[in-house]
Design a protein with these regions (language model features):
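N-terminal cationic and glycine-rich segments that engage phosphates or anionic surfaces
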Residues: 2-6
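Active-site neighborhoods and metal-handling regions in enzymes and metal-associated proteins
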Residues: 10-16, 23-302
Length: 302
């Protein structure tokens, strides 16, 4: 223990050292006050409260990089939405989006991620997430679908998803889509500096239950920016005042997956990716990447 304490003292930055964030500024002019503020917080281990590691905090250059990736990502989602119509295959949408992203000098992050075979995820009706585009999956009137796209531009990642529908959809589907978007926005509003990640999930779950819907707990949001998936895991069903501390410079996704029926899901045994509601009920999801700021948060990708 004594050796560990001594190492921490030795490794502690001095005021005139370069800041750990990579900004090139002196520590005293950059993150010294930030670290002192976090040091003063008394974390409660019984609530799983932890401080965020420095490696997930973005500096100004990182934030600009994420924003540039987000411009392409937003354009890709716009294109995908324009293509949604009865008679088109989900593979056609995938291929068009792939070409769009590549033509802008970026890379579709989903492609080959842990073996995922396509460039985007398209999840229809009872598919919760990770639906694999296929030439055999043809959109028809009454379908609802989530299109999830992540773009990597020069090593910076922007992740977002939107809901779309084809023709006339059921009242249940309309309500699910609308309420799920509201749930995402409530979660984003709860993401405040020097509060905890659990506040997001508590807010999301409260609104979902009030509308008779359930929150998928097996999957959630994540840190995103300098890599596709970073800490922390962002649950959309948990207790407030728990988990990792949210601090300025963190970028995370808020992406509640909401089922019209029960929360249980199952993963396709054949493709290993497609996640469906276990009871066959409809599912919806909206997602934005946000930045925690000194005064609240800022949407980076939507």
């Amino acid at each position: 223990m004594l050796k560990k304490i001594l190492m921490e003292v030795v490794n502690k930055l001095k005021r005139n050292d370069s800041c750990w964030c990579g900004s090139g500024k002196k520590y005293k002019k950059c993150h010294l006050e930030f670290d002192e503020k976090i040091d003063a917080i008394k974390f409660d281990p019984s609530k799983g409260q932890i401080r965020p590691p420095h490696k997930i905090i973005n500096n100004a250059a990182d934030i600009e990089g994420i924003k540039r990736a987000a411009v392409i990502n937003s354009g890709a989602l716009d294109l995908a939405g324009q293509m949604v119509r009865a008679g088109i295959s989900t593979l056609e949408i995938n291929d068009a989006v792939h070409n769009f992203i590549v033509s802008h000098g970026a890379h579709p992050s989903c492609l080959d991620f842990e073996g995922y075979p396509k460039s985007i995820c398209i999840s229809l009706n009872n598919v919760v997430c990770h639906g694999i585009p296929s030439k055999n999956e043809i959109l028809k009137d009454g379908d609802i679908l989530n299109i999830d796209i992540t773009t990597d531009l020069d090593g910076y990642f922007a992740d977002a998803s939107r809901m779309f529908w084809v023709g006339e959809i059921s009242d249940e589907a309309k309500k699910l889509i609308e309420v799920t978007k509201e749930i995402m926005e409530v979660g984003i509003k709860a993401a405040q500096p020097f509060h905890f990640v659990g506040d997001i999930g508590a807010a999301c779950n409260k609104l979902a239950k009030a509308n008779g819907f359930s929150v998928v707990t097996d999957l959630g949001g994540h840190g995103c920016g300098k890599d596709f998936h970073l800490e922390p895991f962002v649950s959309h069903d948990c207790k407030a005042d728990t988990g990792m501390l949210l601090v300025p410079g963190m970028s995370i996704t808020v992406e509640p997956m909401i089922n019209a029926g029960k929360k249980q899901v199952t993963t396709d045994k054949n493709d290993g990716w497609t996640v469906r509601t276990k009871d066959g009920s409809l599912s919806a999801q909206w997602e934005k990447t946000i930045l925690i700021t000194e005064t609240g948060n800022e949407v980076l990708a939507s």
